[in-house]
Structure formats: structure tokens, C-alpha cells
């Protein structure tokens, strides 16, 4: 099923991303430059995304210092890519959200870490064991082919 991308989706995404402000990506385009041709830029985003011809730009890589002295890599997408990500989140979320587990709290609307902690406390009433694990680099190693199969299946 091909989900329609409407111009209003792009406008709403722009407004949400613009509120966060944020710095430039690898293309060095800041908000002043983007807003100078805002309507042209938003139309191009809509045109390319809705026709399947949008391709993201490279991500700017920066490193944040960690308390232990190490560094954590952070990828900063360009403004256009952040808008496209928000468009896709807004369009896909209503289809995918009902399929997530009730005990899943990360990056979900109306859910937060405090609710996750409360769920953990509730779970301790029923279980006498706990598994604590951290998959290093998990998001960098998600098999995208399987992820896309799941998205297509639920949309």
C-alpha cells in the first residue's frame, strides 16, 4: 500500500522541526538559508517524497564527550532530511503504533521513561528474575531489509 504524502504533512513537519531549531547538517544549510526559499524548499520536499524520488544527504558526524572520557558519535541530518523524517513519522505512526507492545515506552507518543519505570516495578510483583542487557551499537546494526518488510506488512 502506498501512503499518500500531502502538502499539509510537509508543512506540519516543517513547523515541528523548526521549533527545535537545531544546527546544520553536512550540507551546511542553516535555517536562515532554508527559510529564504522556504515555500520552494517545502514544495521540492513534497514533490520528491510523494513521487518516491527523495534521497537523503550524508549525515554530519560529531562526537560528544562522555563522562568516562570516551566519545559518543552523533549523526546530524540536514534540515531537509529532518523534515522528511518528521513527515514519515507523522504518516506512518498511526498505522504502526497499534502494533507495538503495551510494555514498550521508548519514542512513543504519550509514553515516557517514568511510565517504563512504573511498568518495571509492576513486573517485579509477578517475576522473581530480571534480564539486564545492552546491545552495543544496536541502532547502527538493525537489518534494514527486515525492518522495511515489517513496515510494508503493517502499512
Question: How does the language model describe each region?
Answer:
Residues 1-155:
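Non-catalytic terminal/accessory segments
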Amino acid at each position: 500500500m502506498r501512503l499518500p504524502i500531502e502538502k499539509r504533512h510537509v508543512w506540519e513537519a516543517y513547523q515541528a522541526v523548526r521549533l527545535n531549531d537545531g544546527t546544520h547538517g553536512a550540507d551546511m544549510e542553516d535555517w536562515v538559508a532554508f527559510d529564504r526559499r522556504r515555500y520552494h524548499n517545502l514544495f521540492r520536499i513534497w514533490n520528491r517524497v510523494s513521487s518516491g524520488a527523495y534521497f537523503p544527504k550524508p549525515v554530519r558526524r560529531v562526537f560528544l564527550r562522555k563522562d568516562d572520557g570516551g566519545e559518543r558519535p552523533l549523526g546530524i541530518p540536514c534540515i531537509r532530511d529532518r523534515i522528511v523524517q518528521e513527515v514519515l513519522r507523522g504518516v506512518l505512526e498511526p498505522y504502526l503504533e497499534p502494533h507495538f507492545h503495551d510494555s514498550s515506552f521508548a519514542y512513543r507518543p504519550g509514553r515516557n521513561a517514568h511510565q517504563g519505570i512504573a511498568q518495571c516495578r509492576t513486573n517485579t510483583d509477578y517475576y522473581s528474575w530480571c534480564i539486564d542487557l545492552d546491545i552495543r551499537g544496536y541502532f547502527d546494526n538493525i537489518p534494514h531489509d527486515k525492518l522495511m518488510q515489517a513496515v510494508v506488512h503493517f502499512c
